[in-house]
Amino acid sequence: MAAAPGGSAQPAGPGPRLGFSTADSGVGMSGLNPGPAVPMKDHDAIKLFVGQIPRGLDEQDLKPLFEEFGRIYELTVLKDRLTGLHKGCAFLTYCARDSALKAQSALHEQKTLPGMNRPIQVKPAASEGRGEDRKLFVGMLGKQQGEEDVRRLFQPFGHIEECTVLRSPDGTSKGCAFVKFGSQGEAQAAIRGLHGSRTMAGASSSLVVKLADTDRERALRRMQQMAGHLGAFHPAPLPLGACGAYTTAILQHQAALLAAAQGPGLGPVAAVAAQMQHVAAFSLVAAPLLPAAAANSPPGSGPGTLPGLPAPIGVNGFGPLTPQTNGQPGSDTLYNNGLSPYPAQSPGVADPLQQAYAGMHHYAAAYPSAYAPVSTAFPQQPSALPQQQREGPEGCNLFIYHLPQEFGDAELIQTFLPFGAVVSAKVFVDRATNQSKCFGFVSFDNPTSAQTAIQAMNGFQIGMKRLKVQLKRPKDANRPY
C-alpha cells in the first residue's frame, strides 16, 4: 500500500473486487497493513435484482457489464444454500442511486446475455418496495390547485421526486394527485403531518394523504370491477387481512348465542341458524334446512318458533361432511355449557354448523393465519382428498396466460372466486429466480362457473397485455393449453 498526498491509502497493485465477502476482499493481517476501505453508498441507494444471468458467470464476470454505469457497492450471485448451485440471478447495489437508475434504464429487457433465451432483468429488488412505500395518493384537493400548489404543500416534508395532478380529458383537475418522495421516512412524515389536517378550498371533506395503491392492488381491483359489471360479482370480497379479526368476532358472537339458547323458545338448532347469518360473509350461500333435521329437533326449536328467522346456510360448492358414527353432530361440543345435546339426526344429515364451516378448511392452507381460529374450534374430519394440486371435473379447469408479474396464488383465487367455488388455483413460478412465469391454472367445481369466468376475463386488458383465459386441454394432449 502506498500513501497518497492526502494521507489516504492507495493500492499498489490491482484493486480488490467490490461487493464480495470479507474473505474475497483480503483483510489486512496487522494494524500496519490495513485492508482496503469499504466503499460508501448513498443513503437512498437502490438494491437491484438481476435475472436471466447465465449460470456460468460469477461476480467477477458480471462486474465489467455493470461497472460502466457507476461504482459498484455490492454484487452477489445467488446460490442454492444446500447444493451451492448458481440460481441464475444476482443482487446489485451501486454506490450512487443515479447509477442504479441508469443501469436499469439501459439494461432491463434490452440485452440478452449469451446462452439465454430471454433478455436480462434489472429492476429494484422486492425489498426495495419499487418505490411503492414512497409514492402517496392525495385526495380532496381543490379543483383550482395545480402541481406547484401541491409541491408547496408537501415541500416541508422532504425532497419531492414526482408530483402529478390527475386531470380529466378536458384538462380540469380531478381533485387528486400523486406525490413521490425521495425516501420512505419523508413519505410517512407527510402522511402524519397532512392527512386529515385541513380542508382545502372547494373540497367536500378533509385532505386525504395515504400510500398509493401498488400495481398488484390496482390490477386486482380492475379485475373485480370487471366481474361486477358483468353481474358475476355481488358482495365485495372480505379483504384477506381482515379475515383473522372477523373469524375471531364470529367465535365471540357464538358464545352470546349459546347463552341466549338457554332461554325459552330458542333451541340449539335455532341458535345455529342465527349464527349462520354471520358466516355468510365468507361467501357461503343460503340453503334450506333439510326436513329430517327439523323433525329431529327438540320441542320449541322448530321453524315455527321464530317465523322470521332466515334459513340456515350451506357451503358454496362443497358438500356436507360425513356424520360421525355415533350419530351425534360434529359440533356437539358447542352444547357442553349446561345444554343437553338434541336427539341424534338421521344418518344422512350433517349438522348445519359443521357443514357451514367445512368449506373454510379448503382455504385454510392458503390463509393459515386467517382461518386458524375456525380450524381450531371446528376440527376437520379426516378427508380422503390428496393435499397436492387438485383439479375440477372435465370442463371446469382453466388456463390463464398474461397474468401480472405481481400476482401470486392468493390474488388468483380472489380474482376468480366471484365466478364460483374455486377448487384450486396455482401461479407457476420459475424455480431458479422465484419469479412468476405469468401463467397459471384455476379449477372450478362446475362447468358453468368456468364458462362465466372465460366470458368475463378472456381478453381483459391489464397494462399492455390482455388476459388469455381458456379451458385447459385434456391430459392426453401434448400441451395443457
From Swiss-Prot:
GO terms for biological process: mRNA splice site recognition; regulation of alternative mRNA splicing, via spliceosome. Keywords: Cytoplasm, mRNA processing, Nucleus, Repeat, RNA-binding. PROSITE patterns: RRM. The lineage of its organism: Eukaryota, Metazoa, Chordata, Craniata, Vertebrata. Belongs to the CELF/BRUNOL family. It holds the Pfam family RRM_1. It comes from Homo sapiens. It is found in: Nucleus; Cytoplasm. This is CUGBP Elav-like family member 6. InterPro entries: CELF3/4/5/6_RRM1, Nucleotide-bd_a/b_plait_sf, RBD_domain_sf, RRM_dom. Expressed mainly in kidney, brain and testis and present in other tissues albeit at lower levels. Also expressed in fetal kidney. Residues 1-34 are annotated as: Disordered. RNA-binding protein implicated in the regulation of pre-mRNA alternative splicing. Mediates exon inclusion and/or exclusion in pre-mRNA that are subject to tissue-specific and developmentally regulated alternative splicing. Specifically activates exon 5 inclusion of TNNT2 in a muscle-specific splicing enhancer (MSE)-dependent manner. Promotes also exon exclusion of INSR pre-mRNA. GO terms for molecular function: mRNA binding; RNA binding. GO terms for cellular component: cytoplasm; nucleus; ribonucleoprotein complex. Residues 46-127, 134-214, 396-474 form the RRM domain. The keyword Coiled coil does not apply. Residues 1-12 have a biased composition (Low complexity).
